Amino acid sequence: MKRLTAVIYPGETGRWFVAFNPETGTTSQGRSVEQAVKNLKEATELYLEENELPERSPAFLTTFEVALA
């Protein structure tokens, strides 16, 4: 068993959520956060049936600033 990261983004309409796993690059969606994570887990498990988990450092989040015109 391996604990992986799920980054969740709300869809543009707010009716869907997109889930992304940075360790594998897998992505999925769902009508709720829970459904998006469940679908991401399934997509990631399918990915890992054919591919090994990449050797990467654990993901972390940070912030940065950009200039706006």
Provide a role label for each language-model segment.
Residues I8-E23:
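Short aromatic-glycine-(Arg/Gly/Cys) micro-motifs in beta-strand/loop hairpins
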Residues T26-Q29:
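Short, well-ordered beta-strand elements within core beta-sheets of diverse protein domains
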Residues M1-T5, T13, R31-E34, K38-A69:
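Short, charged, surface-exposed hinge/linker loops at domain edges
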